Amino acid sequence: LVGGDTVQGHLSITITICGKAPDKEVLKRTTAEPNDMIFVSGTLGDGRAALSLIQQKKCVSERLLYRFYCPQPMIDLGVELRNLVSSCIDISDGLVSDLTHICNASKVSAVLDVSNLPVHEEVKQLFPDDFAEFGLYGGDDYQLCFTAPESEKAKIINAGMRSNSRITPIGRIVKSMGSNKVMLEGMDVNENISG
């Protein structure tokens, strides 16, 4: 397996953790269903915003630096969600990329409402023309993207509060549209916002 940890350098440390869980408590990519709501935790685009500022040698706030260099895995939230959601993935490569993994594995498509993307106000102010692109395509956020029946929405919001995590509904799973795509208001995301 070749991934994001394959870089040129003098030292590479790879850690693998294995464990067991009851089958009904495993968060999978393969079990999203049409009509499920799509949710994300936290805010999106912070990692991409921080990287852009660092590359431009501009001042970066402590909040963005912390989000970029010290991402926090959403373990507590994942535990809270395990009996509520139909599918789940962490957002490491960007929302569209990672949600596409769910769509492909579950043989469904997704429709996103970009106006609901939870992008932090700081990122919106710093990048007024790019914040939606950062939220859709920026990586290194390590938030969770998950799907669930609408009947579970209140329980999911409560699970977010118990784990101190903001939860935002951002779209809906639909039947596969020929190829398993992530769509924006009925159009291919890549036709609307370049990433």
Predicted segment positions?
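Glycine-rich, charged/polar anion/phosphate-binding loops
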Residues: V2, P22-L27, M74-I75, V96-L99, ...
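Glycine-rich anion-binding loops of enzyme active sites
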Residues: V2-L53, R172
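Glycine-/charge-enriched secondary-structure boundary and capping motifs
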Residues: V7-L11, C18, N83-L84, C88-G195
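Generic structural "secondary-structure junction" signal
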Residues: Q8, K28-R29, V40, D46, ...
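Hydrophobic side chains in well-ordered alpha-helices
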Residues: V26, L77, K155-A159
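Internal active-site segments that recognize and position negatively charged phosphoryl groups
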Residues: D36-G42, C70-L95
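Alpha-helical scaffold segments in soluble metabolic enzymes
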Residues: M37, T43, A50-L53, E80-N83, ...
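A short, charged helix-loop
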Residues: A50-L53, K57-Q72
